[in-house]
Each structure stands twice: as C-alpha cells, then as structure tokens.
C-alpha cells in the first residue's frame, strides 16, 4: 500500500519521538506472527509499560539516521517492529520480547536493538534479555549473603545442643 508524503513524515516523526524518549529499543521481525498473537503481545507489553510500533524499514532508517548512536545498525530483515521502553528498567523491552519469542516458538525474533545509545546485534540483545530483573538479582544477592550466615547459625545450634546434653 502506497503511503503519501505527509503520512511518511508523520511516521518518521513518531519513530523519532520514540527513539528520543526510549531508554532502550529492540528491533523484532514479526513476519511469521499471526495477528491474534501480535494483539496479545501488544496488550502484554502495554501492561508492562513497553511500547510497540511498526514502521517501514526505509522510514525507520530515516528516523535512525537523525540520531547519533554508536556502532553499526543491524541488518533489518523481514517485517520490522520497534519495541521500546521509557521506564527505569532498560532491559524490560528485550526481556519481554525474548520471553514472548520463547513462548511463540520463534515466530517473532529479535534482530538487534539500541542499548545505552549503542546499536546492538541479535546475540547482544539476547544476552541483555537473559539478565534477570533487578528484584530477582537482589533476591539472589541476599541469598548468597544469607547462606553462610545460616550455616554458621546451624553450626552454633549443633554445638549448643551437644553441650546441653
């Protein structure tokens, strides 16, 4: 479907606004994803405070050319959507898309992204997506600190039981 010049300009401005406000961006290929699953994913993402927008590759590249990101833009193959987050958790968009990618059997794929003002490859964005959330990391840290203390308390308890006998 042909898009007139005004509509193209509007799309480029929208994507540019997304890029300006986003803390991180994930480029996804959604070619094999049915509309019903796309709708489900959009609702899930929206509930998490993550945005999802679709744009033609040429218009996306035009919006990206206005921004100075380090690195090389990953190859944008297939039908491209931009998943972006504007909140404190910079890894949330990548994590949510990665979870949906595993759930959908690979019908949607991460093809790259922008993290900390640097273009990232597919593998780098997948690594970022596999990092647990801040809450989980804090819980793991507390567990690591707490384990030796628990062992020490058990040892003291056993010693006190032996002495009381």
Cite the ranges covered by each PLM segment:
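Short amphipathic alpha-helical segments with heptad-repeat character
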Residues: 2, 9, 16, 139-146, ...
């Amino acid at each position: 479907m042909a898009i007139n010049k005004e509509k193209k300009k509007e799309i480029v401005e929208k994507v540019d606004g997304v890029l300006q406000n986003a803390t991180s961006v994930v480029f996804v290929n959604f070619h094999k994803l049915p509309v019903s699953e796309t709708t489900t994913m959009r609702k899930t993402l929206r509930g998490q405070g993550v945005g999802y927008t679709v744009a033609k590759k040429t218009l996306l590249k035009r919006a990206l050319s206005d921004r100075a990101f380090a690195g090389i833009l990953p190859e944008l193959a297939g039908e491209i959507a931009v998943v972006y987050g504007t909140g404190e958790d910079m890894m949330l968009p990548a994590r949510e898309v990665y979870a949906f990618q595993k759930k959908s059997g690979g019908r949607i794929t991460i093809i790259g992204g922008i993290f900390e003002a640097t273009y990232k490859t597919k593998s780098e964005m997948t690594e970022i997506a596999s990092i647990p959330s801040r809450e989980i990391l804090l819980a793991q840290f507390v567990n690591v600190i707490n384990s030796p203390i628990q062992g020490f308390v058990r040892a003291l308890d056993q010693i006190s039981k032996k002495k009381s006998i």
